[in-house]
């Protein structure tokens, strides 16, 4: 028993020593603590500052997502459930906007027809930059039940770029909430300032 404790103590001491050696050999600038972010390149103070700037910008963007509702069919009812008190989208910073010029996210919910496709593209183009799209339901994802109809667009991704697909017919409000949380994770990984610096 005593020898097992000594062996375990020796192993933990070796691990601690190797961790300290790795930390001392890293090329982090003096006075700057590494935080474990995947975008940190400690070779430059400017890159460190831009990584922190990206973190702050991403925190602000993912904490205040303003979606535009583009409800075309029965999936829009589940989008309304998402706004109701049971799921309380406001606690995630999601507030519906009525104008595309004030929105940074669009929920495409329902069947997109060929005649509606130009309007969808026009609305998407009116949104300011840093814009995202959540395609909600099988009809918006790929045509769904009406896939082979002559007047149906087989997925809104043929007209606008889609960031998150929420499956279901219709998807539940929990599924839409999960899609919003996945979008927040995607926003958290953005690194615009660092890419600008490296150009």
Swiss-Prot record:
It catalyses: a ubiquinone + NADH + 5 H(+)(in) = a ubiquinol + NAD(+) + 4 H(+)(out). Belongs to the complex I 20 kDa subunit family. GO terms for molecular function: 4 iron, 4 sulfur cluster binding; metal ion binding; NADH dehydrogenase (ubiquinone) activity; quinone binding. Complex I is composed of 45 different subunits This is a component of the iron-sulfur (IP) fragment of the enzyme. Its cofactor is [4Fe-4S] cluster. Residues 1-16 form a transit peptide. This is Probable NADH dehydrogenase [ubiquinone] iron-sulfur protein 7, mitochondrial. The gene is nduf-7. Core subunit of the mitochondrial membrane respiratory chain NADH dehydrogenase (Complex I) that is believed to belong to the minimal assembly required for catalysis. Complex I functions in the transfer of electrons from NADH to the respiratory chain. The immediate electron acceptor for the enzyme is believed to be ubiquinone. [4Fe-4S] cluster binds at residues 74-75, 139, 169. One of its GO terms (cellular component) is mitochondrion. Its EC number is 7.1.1.2. Binds 1 [4Fe-4S] cluster. It is found in: Mitochondrion. PROSITE patterns: COMPLEX1_20K (PS01150). SUPFAM superfamilies: HydA/Nqo6-like. Keywords: 4Fe-4S, Electron transport, Iron, Iron-sulfur, Metal-binding, Mitochondrion, NAD, Oxidoreductase, Respiratory chain, Transit peptide, Translocase, Transport, Ubiquinone. It comes from Caenorhabditis briggsae. Transmembrane segments: none annotated. Signal peptide: none annotated. GO terms for biological process: aerobic respiration; electron transport coupled proton transport; mitochondrial respiratory chain complex I assembly. Its main location: mitochondrion. It comes from the Eukaryota.
């Amino acid at each position: 028993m005593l020898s097992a404790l000594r062996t375990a103590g020796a192993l933990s001491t070796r691990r601690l020593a190797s961790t300290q050696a790795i930390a001392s050999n890293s090329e982090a600038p003096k006075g700057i603590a590494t935080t474990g972010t995947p975008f940190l390149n400690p070779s430059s103070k400017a890159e460190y500052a831009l990584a922190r700037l990206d973190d702050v910008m991403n925190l602000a963007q993912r904490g205040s997502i303003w979606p535009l509702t583009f409800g075309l069919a029965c999936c829009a009812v589940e989008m309304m459930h998402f706004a109701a008190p049971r799921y309380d989208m406001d606690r995630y910073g999601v507030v519906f906007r009525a104008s595309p010029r004030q929105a940074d996210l669009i929920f495409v919910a329902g069947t997109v027809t060929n005649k509606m496709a130009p309007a969808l593209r026009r609305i998407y183009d009116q949104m300011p930059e840093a814009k995202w799209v959540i395609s909600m339901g099988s009809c918006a994802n790929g045509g769904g039940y009406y896939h082979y109809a002559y007047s149906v667009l087989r997925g809104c991704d043929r007209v606008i770029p889609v960031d998150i697909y929420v499956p279901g017919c219709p998807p539940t409000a929990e599924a839409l909430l999960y899609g919003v949380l996945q979008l927040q994770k995607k926003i958290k990984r953005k690194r615009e300032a660092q890419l600008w610096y490296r150009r």
